[in-house]
Amino acid sequence: MAEAETALQMAARHVAEQEARVREQEELVARSQREGRPTDQAEGMLAEMGNMLDAIRDHLERLRQTREE
């Protein structure tokens, strides 16, 4: 039976997953730009995804600091 994921492991996984989503969205924006399609909505979504990534990274850092104390 697999061990339960710790809060720190889960936060690290969430960071990695969100980084992958951001990369995919960046690729979508770039492809749309190359094809001459509007990118306003895709760029707005990318900005929101970046904000979420920042928040998740902050949470991970707080967990790491708590663990070190």
Can you say where each PLM-predicted feature lies in the sequence?
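Anionic, Ser/Thr-rich low-complexity intrinsically disordered regions
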Residues: 1-69
